[in-house]
C-alpha cells in the first residue's frame, strides 16, 4: 500500500482535489477515492438499489446522497398518469428506494425538483473542492465550481451507495485557455462549441480539463456550468473552473452551503483551489475569444460545428479519408448540402432547455430575442426550465408571458427533448434548433435532425424559421 503524494511541487487544480480525496492506493490497483456527493435519478439507480437489497447492505452515507426525478418526467403535467408505464415504474421505484434507504428525494411534486445538474448547484449541494458523481454523463457540469465531477455506471452507483468510495485511475491534465473577451451575441455555449470544433469530439479523451482565461473568468456561474457540461463532448473525463468571487457569491446563502463561521472558513479554503504558478499540464489548448462567432452544429456530433456566418463544410476539402467519410455520412443523415449558408437552413422545431442551457440566464437570453415577436408559421418551440426554482424565478420576472405571447410553449421542469426518453421527442425528418448537448443520430427521436445552438440562437431561429446571425438585424 502506497500513500498519496505530499510533494511541494506546484499542482494543478485537479491534482489538489484528487490528492485530497485519495484514501488508498493498493499496489497494482487503481487508487480508491472518497466521494463527497452522490446524485441519483430514476434511470440509472434502480439496479443499484436492487443490488444493495439483495446483498443486505445499507447506504454508507445517506446524507450525502441526493435524488431527483428528471429524465422520464412529463413537462406537460406533474401527474403520474401523464407518464408512460415504464417511466411511471421508474419514478415510483426511485421513490420507494429513497424511502427504504433514507435518501433525500426531490420528486415531481417538490418545488425544488429539476434536472439533477441544475438543482444540485442551485441548492448548494455542489461545492468547491468536492468529488461529485452521478449515473449521468453530464455530471461534469458541477466542475464549474472547482469540484471534480464525473459520470459513473450503474455498478459504480451501487458501489458508491455502499462504500462512499470509488476506484479511479488518475487522469491526465489539459488546460484550455480562452484569452480575451467575446463580442456581443457570443455566449458560453458558443465558447464551448468552438472549443470542441477545434480539438474534436475525442480531443479530450483521457484528460481532466481546466478551463481558464479572461473569457472564462468573465462568465457567470450559469455560463461556466454550460462550458463544463460539455467537457464530456470533447471526450474529457471532467471539466473544471477554479472557484473565485463569482463562485462564492453564487453559493452564499444556498440551502446546503456552509453557514456563519463555517462559511468564512470554507471560503478561505476554497481560495486555495487554483492551479499553482509553474504547475505543468499534459496538454494545452489556446483560443482567442474575439475570434469566436455564434456557433451551430451542422452534423451528427458536437465537433461538427461552424460559425453562423460560414457555409456547410465540404467533405471534399478534408484530406483525412476517415474524417471525410464521417462528414459525408453526417451530411447524408442531416440532409444538408455542402456549401449551403447556415443562415439558409430552415427548422421546424426548437427546444430551449436541458442541463446545458435551462438556467435563468439562459431563459433571459432567449426571452430577449422573443420579446415582442412571434414564432414563425410551421415552427413548434418549447421552453423547459431546468428546475422548479428556475421556473418560479422566470415567472416572477415575466419571462413565461414573453414566451407564451410569442407562441412558445412554457413547460414544467425536466430533461425533456434532450433525449428521446420521454414524451417530448422529434418525429423523423424534423429539424430542431436545440440548446442541448448532443446531436447524435436519433438522439431526440428516430430520424430526427439536431443542431446545437445557444438559447439566443434557438429563440431567434424560432422567430425567423431558419438560423440567423443574432449579431445582425433579422
Curated annotation (Swiss-Prot):
Its cofactor is [4Fe-4S] cluster. Binds 1 [4Fe-4S] cluster per subunit. Keywords: 4Fe-4S, Amino-acid biosynthesis, Branched-chain amino acid biosynthesis, Iron, Iron-sulfur, Leucine biosynthesis, Lyase, Metal-binding. CDD domains: IPMI. Heterodimer of LeuC and LeuD. Catalyzes the isomerization between 2-isopropylmalate and 3-isopropylmalate, via the formation of 2-isopropylmaleate. This is 3-isopropylmalate dehydratase large subunit. It comes from Shewanella sp. (strain ANA-3).
Amino acid at each position: 500500500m502506497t500513500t498519496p503524494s505530499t510533494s511541494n511541487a506546484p499542482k494543478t487544480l485537479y491534482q489538489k482535489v484528487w490528492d485530497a480525496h485519495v484514501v488508498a492506493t493498493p499496489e497494482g490497483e487503481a487508487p480508491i477515492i472518497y466521494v463527497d456527493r452522490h446524485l441519483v435519478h430514476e434511470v440509472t439507480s434502480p439496479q443499484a438499489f436492487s443490488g444493495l437489497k439483495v446483498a443486505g447492505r445499507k447506504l454508507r452515507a445517506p446524507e450525502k446522497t441526493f435524488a431527483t426525478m428528471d429524465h422520464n418526467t412529463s413537462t406537460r403535467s406533474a401527474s403520474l398518469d401523464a407518464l408512460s408505464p415504464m417511466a411511471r415504474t421508474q419514478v415510483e421505484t426511485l421513490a420507494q428506494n429513497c424511502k427504504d434507504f433514507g435518501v433525500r428525494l426531490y420528486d415531481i411534486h417538490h418545488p425544488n425538483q429539476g434536472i439533477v445538474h441544475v438543482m444540485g448547484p442551485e441548492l448548494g449541494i455542489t461545492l468547491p473542492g468536492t468529488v461529485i458523481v452521478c449515473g449521468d454523463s453530464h455530471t461534469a457540469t458541477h466542475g464549474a465550481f472547482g469540484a471534480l465531477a464525473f459520470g459513473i455506471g450503474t455498478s459504480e452507483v451501487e458501489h458508491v451507495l455502499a462504500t462512499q468510495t470509488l476506484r479511479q485511475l488518475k487522469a491526465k491534465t489539459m488546460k484550455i485557455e480562452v484569452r480575451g473577451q467575446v463580442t456581443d451575441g457570443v455566449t458560453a455555449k458558443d465558447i464551448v462549441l468552438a472549443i470542441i470544433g477545434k480539438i474534436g469530439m475525442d480531443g479530450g479523451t483521457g484528460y481532466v480539463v481546466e478551463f481558464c482565461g479572461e473569457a472564462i473568468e468573465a462568465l457567470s456561474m450559469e455560463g461556466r456550468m454550460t462550458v463544463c457540461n460539455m467537457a464530456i463532448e470533447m471526450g474529457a473525463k471532467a471539466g473544471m473552473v477554479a472557484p473565485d468571487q463569482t463562485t462564492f457569491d453564487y453559493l452564499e446563502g444556498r440551502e446546503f452551503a456552509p453557514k456563519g463561521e463555517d462559511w468564512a472558513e470554507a471560503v478561505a479554503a476554497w481560495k486555495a483551489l487554483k492551479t499553482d504558478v509553474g504547475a505543468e499540464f499534459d496538454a494545452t489548448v489556446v483560443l482567442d475569444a474575439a475570434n469566436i462567432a455564434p456557433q451551430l452544429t451542422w452534423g451528427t456530433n458536437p465537433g461538427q460545428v461552424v460559425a453562423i456566418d460560414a457555409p456547410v463544410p465540404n467533405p471534399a476539402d478534408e484530406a483525412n479519408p476517415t474524417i471525410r467519410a464521417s462528414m459525408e455520412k453526417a451530411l447524408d443523415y442531416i440532409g444538408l448540402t455542402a456549401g449551403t449558408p447556415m443562415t439558409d437552413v430552415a427548422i421546424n422545431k426548437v427546444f430551449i432547455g436541458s442541463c446545458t442551457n435551462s438556467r435563468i440566464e439562459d431563459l433571459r437570453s432567449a426571452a430577449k430575442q422573443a420579446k415582442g415577436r412571434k414564432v414563425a408559421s410551421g415552427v413548434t418551440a418549447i421552453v423547459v426550465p431546468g428546475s422548479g426554482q428556475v421556473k418560479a424565478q422566470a415567472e416572477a420576472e415575466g419571462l413565461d408571458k414573453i414566451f407564451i405571447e410569442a407562441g412558445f410553449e412554457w413547460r414544467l421542469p425536466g430533461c425533456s427533448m434532450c433525449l428521446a426518453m420521454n414524451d417530448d421527442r422529434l418525429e423523423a425528418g424534423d429539424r430542431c434548433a436545440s440548446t442541448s448537448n448532443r446531436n447524435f443520430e436519433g438522439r431526440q427521436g428516430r430520424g430526427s435532425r439536431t443542431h446545437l445552438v445557444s438559447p439566443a440562437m434557438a429563440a431567434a431561429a424560432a422567430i425567423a424559421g431558419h438560423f440567423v446571425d443574432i449579431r445582425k438585424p433579422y
